[in-house]
């Protein structure tokens, strides 16, 4: 029977990417870098809703992207919940367009990590200008490709080795720690808020089973926009109660 062809861009030239953006040489200090300790307790799920307009108002008042305003608010809330003054957060960027494969159906992303230092009197306006500048720098095509090359170089080198799959998996995990993936929380935005509602988005906000687990972080926060309401789908591996109250 006839099937509709699935259109996907061909694979990008990883060897050319590695040649253009060579990975820095690893040293003894690379293996000894400090890595944030993440919680690995039983997963608990929380939904938090806020109006899209309230987030936009916060962003406009501070002259930053809504994404940055949300990240800043989460950092302030999680300081009390996690009991830490230094909060590390990570996010991923879609690199398909920058890599010249806009219709790729395979995974084509890079990840960035930043940290923010907080105190008792820290306000949103104190932290979001620097956070926003960092986000804007990292989302430039050249910066995304360079980061993607550095993160893929580890995968590329390990894949070339003649070793059992279980050994490669362990080495991949070590590479994640070296590249600084672990964070207090991951933040991602699902869907395009300018497009009409889709069944997939509606299902996502209700079905825990389709949420993305927070690998490499104490919690994963996925924000989706639907009918003027932003839903935060949070999977939390920290043992402390009271996350929802902290976010309010």
Predicted regions and their residues:
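Gly/Ser/Thr-rich phosphate-binding loops and adjoining beta-strand/alpha-helix segments
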Residues: 33-96, 228-230
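Amphipathic alpha-helical recognition patches that constitute DNA-binding helices
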Residues: 7-9, 13, 65, 69, ...
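Short charge-dense sequence patches
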Residues: 5-11, 19-29, 76-85, 195-204
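Non-catalytic, low-complexity flexible loops and terminal extensions
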Residues: 1-58
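Acyl-thioester-dependent acyl-group transfer interface
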Residues: 79-248
């Amino acid at each position: 029977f006839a099937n509709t062809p699935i259109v996907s861009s061909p694979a990008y030239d990883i060897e050319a990417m590695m040649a253009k953006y060579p990975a820095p040489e690893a040293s003894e200090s690379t293996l000894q870098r400090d890595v944030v300790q993440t919680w690995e307790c039983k997963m608990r799920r929380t939904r938090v809703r806020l109006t899209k307009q309230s987030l936009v108002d916060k962003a406009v008042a501070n002259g930053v992207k809504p994404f940055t305003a949300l990240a800043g608010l989460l950092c302030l809330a999680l300081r009390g919940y996690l009991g830490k003054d230094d909060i590390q957060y990570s996010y991923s960027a879609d690199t398909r367009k920058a890599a010249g494969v806009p219709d790729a159906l395979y995974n084509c992303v890079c990840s960035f990590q930043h940290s923010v230092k907080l105190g008792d009197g820290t306000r949103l306006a104190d932290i979001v200008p620097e956070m926003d500048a960092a986000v804007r720098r990292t989302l430039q095509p050249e910066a995304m490709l360079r980061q993607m090359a550095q993160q893929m170089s580890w995968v590329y080198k390990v894949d070339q080795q003649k070793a059992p799959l279980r050994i490669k998996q362990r080495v991949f995990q070590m590479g994640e720690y070296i590249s600084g993936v672990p964070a207090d929380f991951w933040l991602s935005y699902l869907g395009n808020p300018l497009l009409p509602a889709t069944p997939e988005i509606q299902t996502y906000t209700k079905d825990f089973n389709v949420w993305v687990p927070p690998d490499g972080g104490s919690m994963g926060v996925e924000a989706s926009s639907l009918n003027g309401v932003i839903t935060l789908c949070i999977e939390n591996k920290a043992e402390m109660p009271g996350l929802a109250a902290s976010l309010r």
